[in-house]
UniProtKB/Swiss-Prot annotation:
The keyword tRNA-binding applies. GO terms for cellular component: cytosol; small ribosomal subunit. Residues 93-118 are annotated as: Disordered. The keyword Endoplasmic reticulum does not apply. It comes from Azotobacter vinelandii (strain DJ / ATCC BAA-1303). InterPro entries: Rbsml_uS13_C, Ribosomal_uS13, Ribosomal_uS13-like_H2TH, Ribosomal_uS13_bac-type, Ribosomal_uS13_CS. Belongs to the universal ribosomal protein uS13 family. This is Small ribosomal subunit protein uS13. Located at the top of the head of the 30S subunit, it contacts several helices of the 16S rRNA. In the 70S ribosome it contacts the 23S rRNA (bridge B1a) and protein L5 of the 50S subunit (bridge B1b), connecting the 2 subunits; these bridges are implicated in subunit movement. Contacts the tRNAs in the A and P-sites. Part of the 30S ribosomal subunit. Forms a loose heterodimer with protein S19. Forms two bridges to the 50S subunit in the 70S ribosome. It comes from the Bacteria. Gene3D superfamilies: 1.10.8.50, 30s ribosomal protein s13, domain 2.
Length: 118
């Protein structure tokens, strides 16, 4: 297994699919990385040379991925909560943030049902 950005990349999958195992790299970004490095997106990781894998590492290193991206997202959510804006309040209360209905549904965000005490 090749290791890129601290993630073990599967050898037996296509390059584009393997790169999506990195947090912050989706299909579109993976295709852009392959185009920038000149690596065939349909080639499997085990068939790539060490030089090509180094090129992929270099391109991925230019992006914000893994721990840095997770930290950045958490800091943005924390900033909203500190501001006290509507989105921050929804995050703080553990409710849907983007305007979804909550009378029914929203169980994933709200958690399991709590019994009504009489």
């Amino acid at each position: 297994m090749a290791r890129i950005a601290g993630v073990n990349i599967p050898d037996n999958k296509h390059t584009v699919i393997s790169l999506t195992y990195i947090y912050g790299v989706g299909r579109t970004t993976a295709q852009a990385i392959c185009a920038a490095t000149g690596v065939n997106p349909a080639a499997k990781i085990k068939d790539l040379s060490d030089e090509q894998i180094e090129q992929l590492r270099g391109e991925v290193a230019k992006l914000t991925t893994e721990g840095d991206l997770r930290r950045e997202v958490n800091m943005k959510i924390k900033r909203l909560m500190d501001l006290g804006c509507y989105r921050g309040l929804r995050h703080r209360r553990g409710l849907p943030v983007r305007g979804q209905r909550t009378k029914t549904n929203a169980r994933t965000r709200k958690g399991p049902r709590k019994p009504i005490r009489k």
